[in-house]
A protein has these predicted regions:
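Conserved PLP-enzyme active-site core in the AAT-like
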Residues: 2, 10-19, 80-280, 287, ...
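N-terminal "arm"/small-domain region of PLP-dependent enzymes with the aminotransferase-like
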Residues: 1-61, 69, 371
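Conserved N-terminal alpha-helix of the aminotransferase class I/II PLP-enzyme fold
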Residues: 38-88, 113-120
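Short hydrophobic/aromatic beta-strand micro-patches
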Residues: 224, 312-314, 374-376
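Conserved small-domain helix->loop->beta segment predominantly found in fold-type I
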Residues: 271-332, 336-341, 355-365
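C-terminal core of ALDH-fold dehydrogenases
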Residues: 3, 10-27, 323-360
Length: 395
């Protein structure tokens, strides 16, 4: 059989009979203690405890193994570590590869908690962090130090949505520091719209809380690694006590089955909203990777197979507190909430100085209020009507 379509892989991955045991979905195996019938069975389990066999609940159960196998098939990895949330996935994956005296490079458009982990935790451990512009490309070579151990990407960038020239960055890192680990927060692409490991990235990290679970009712993080990094990542996660419960692992596997159709709708609807916003007289610019003119659009077009529902736009004016309240408090379909990736549409606002505070060594090139949207699965014309009504409140 020729290579399967992504939609088929999403439905089939991790569903072998050893995990489903006669049902359609993988079984939910809740267990701390796993019983051995013989001394020899216990010896074998102990010997193979790092190889995906039943040993102890913290190493995983059939429910976890099913999800991990699916993630490896989807992202092309040698192994997948599971974490209680996306922030834990980022923090523990970084910790697995650094020690006192090391240096890491992180994009200055990374998710705020990822930045905070570097400045507030790693700094105490004697690990220094340098920051780079998301559009740096091959210029990153100039920032690599002899002790640079990790280069951390996030594409698109948080809030302002810049897309990296990943091949240029990775090539520069491999030439200048071949032993350095390249990892990426790949949450926006859900691990499937951008196949990170195919671009010679070592580890693809996700807040699977977002699109994989897909219903805003669970929290989990994943890190899919290549063979070079897998043993070290796996053992560090185990020693740090990182795990998720079987029910959340099951919910993630279940969410994966509909990921393809959901992402297509997110792409279609978000792009239609972005194109409408780009023509609106109150909007200065739209930051949507699939929209021509968005920063790094050419790299999205070359390297990605689609877009998700998260993007932002900048108003021509800065809203004052009263205008912000009038604008945000009265939407019918858009809710104010952190996170994203579920079926519902969300909205948040940030002033330019708030964004600037999240850009170490960088600046913002706009003065109006930035609005971040997550376009859900509602009818797109209804969503546009809701946004249009919002603009009427701030004219």
């Amino acid at each position: 059989m020729t290579k399967k379509h992504l939609d088929t892989t999403l439905v089939q991955a991790g569903r072998s009979k050893k995990y489903t045991q006669g049902s359609v979905n993988s079984v939910i195996q809740r267990a701390s203690s796993l019983v051995f019938d013989t001394v020899e069975e216990k010896k074998n389990a102990t010997r193979n405890r790092a190889k995906g066999g039943l040993f102890y609940g913290r190493r995983g159960t059939l429910t976890h193994f099913s999800l991990q196998e699916a993630m490896c098939e989807l992202e092309g990895g040698a192994g997948c570590a599971l974490f209680p949330c996306g922030a834990a996935a980022v923090a523990n994956t970084i910790l697995a590869f650094v020690e006192q005296g090391d240096h890491i490079l992180m994009t200055n458009t990374a998710y705020e908690p990822s930045q905070d982990f570097c400045t507030k935790i790693l700094s105490k451990l004697g690990v220094t962090t340098g920051w780079f512009d998301p559009l740096i490309g091959e210029g990153i070579a100039e920032l690599i130090q002899p002790n640079t151990r990790i280069v951390f990407l996030e594409s698109p960038g948080s809030l302002t949505m810049e897309v990296h020239d990943v091949p240029a960055i990775v090539k520069a890192v491999r030439n200048k520091a071949p032993e350095a680990i390249v990892m990426i927060d790949n949450t926006w692409a859900a691990g499937v719209l951008f196949k990170a490991l195919e671009f010679d990235i070592d580890i693809s990290i996700q807040a699977a809380t977002k699109y994989l679970i897909g219903h805003s009712d669970g929290m989990i993080g994943t890190a899919v690694s290549n063979a070079r990094c897998w043993d070290q990542l796996r053992e560090n996660a185990y020693l740090m006590g990182q795990m998720v419960d079987a029910d959340t692992a099951y919910m993630t596997s279940r969410g994966i089955r509909t990921l393809g159709v959901r992402l297509r709708q997110h792409h279609e609807s978000s792009l239609k909203v972005a194109e409408w916003l780009a023509q609106h007289p109150l909007v200065e610019r739209v930051n949507h990777p699939a929209l021509p003119g968005s920063k790094g659009h050419e790299f999205w077009q070359r390297d990605f197979t689609g877009s998700s529902g998260l993007f932002s736009f900048v108003l021509k004016k800065r809203l004052n507190n009263d205008e912000l309240a009038s604008y945000l408090d009265n939407f019918t379909l858009f809710s104010m909430a952190y996170s994203w990736g579920g079926f519902e549409s969300l909205i948040l606002a940030n002033q330019p100085e708030q964004i600037a505070a999240l850009r170490p060594g960088g600046e913002v090139d706009f003065s109006g209020t930035l609005i971040r949207l997550h376009i859900g699965l509602e009818n797109v014309d209804d969503l546009i009507a809701d946004l249009a009504a919002g603009f009427e409140r701030i004219v």
